[in-house]
Amino acid sequence: MTPPLFHIGEVVATHGVFTHLEQHRIAAFPYLRRHACGDWGMVPPEDAAANRFAVEHGARVLSSYDIAGKRVWIITEADRGMTTLLFPDEY
């Protein structure tokens, strides 16, 4: 198993994402693991490159996954203190 590339800190989710995951009985952990291990899901190449830079230089990391028919973003802050799961329209 690939080791995490960075610490994700405290994990929080918006009410909308929390409800969506709960309704579909989907755990967030596999997506958080992918995010921390460098599988950033459905991001364009320029965002993937920005994430690689962010991991090395301490900037914000963004992943994007389709989860049960809805796009969910996972964002880890630059200081690695918090990771948030949210819908793009909640940004």
Residue ranges of model-derived segments:
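Short, compact, well-ordered microdomains
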Residues: 57-91
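Compact soluble domain cores
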Residues: 2-61
